């Protein structure tokens, strides 16, 4: 299955504790159907001290389901993502609301 959400996309959270907040995707895990979004779904982890890093409680992003986030189009509104095959045979993502190409 082709990836509708990719690294670097600006997305908005649709459900949950962070509903309505936007952020940038910095990692997608297609096998798990999740993504990591910068500053969204933050959790606290207890870090054991090592020679390389200090111990303590750190905040980090937890994965969020792809179904719970939506791509934010150029108009700033969330939209669904579809695919279109151009005349030269290239497959590009399009915003369903406006029909505009996302990447090309």
Curated annotation (Swiss-Prot):
Q: Which UniProt keywords apply?
A: Ribonucleoprotein, Ribosomal protein, RNA-binding, rRNA-binding
Give GO cellular component annotations, separated by semicolons. cytosolic large ribosomal subunit
Gene3D superfamilies recorded for this chain? 2.30.30.30
Q: Name one GO biological process term.
A: translation
Matching SMART domains: KOW
Q: Which GO terms describe its molecular function?
A: rRNA binding; structural constituent of ribosome
Query: Which residues are the signal sequence here?
Result: none
Family of the protein in this entry: Belongs to the universal ribosomal protein uL24 family.
Q: What is this protein called?
A: Large ribosomal subunit protein uL24
Source organism:
Bradyrhizobium diazoefficiens (strain JCM 10833 / BCRC 13528 / IAM 13628 / NBRC 14792 / USDA 110)
């Amino acid at each position: 299955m082709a990836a509708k959400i990719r690294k670097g996309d600006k997305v908005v959270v649709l459900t949950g504790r962070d509903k309505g907040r936007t952020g940038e995707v910095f990692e997608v895990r297609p096998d798990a159907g999740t993504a990591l979004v910068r500053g969204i779904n933050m959790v606290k982890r207890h870090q054991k001290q090592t020679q390389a890093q200090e111990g303590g409680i750190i905040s980090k992003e937890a994965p969020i389901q792809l179904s719970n986030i939506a791509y934010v189009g150029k108009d700033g509104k969330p939209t669904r993502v579809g695919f279109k095959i151009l005349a030269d045979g290239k497959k590009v993502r399009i915003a369903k609301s406006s029909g505009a190409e996302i990447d090309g």
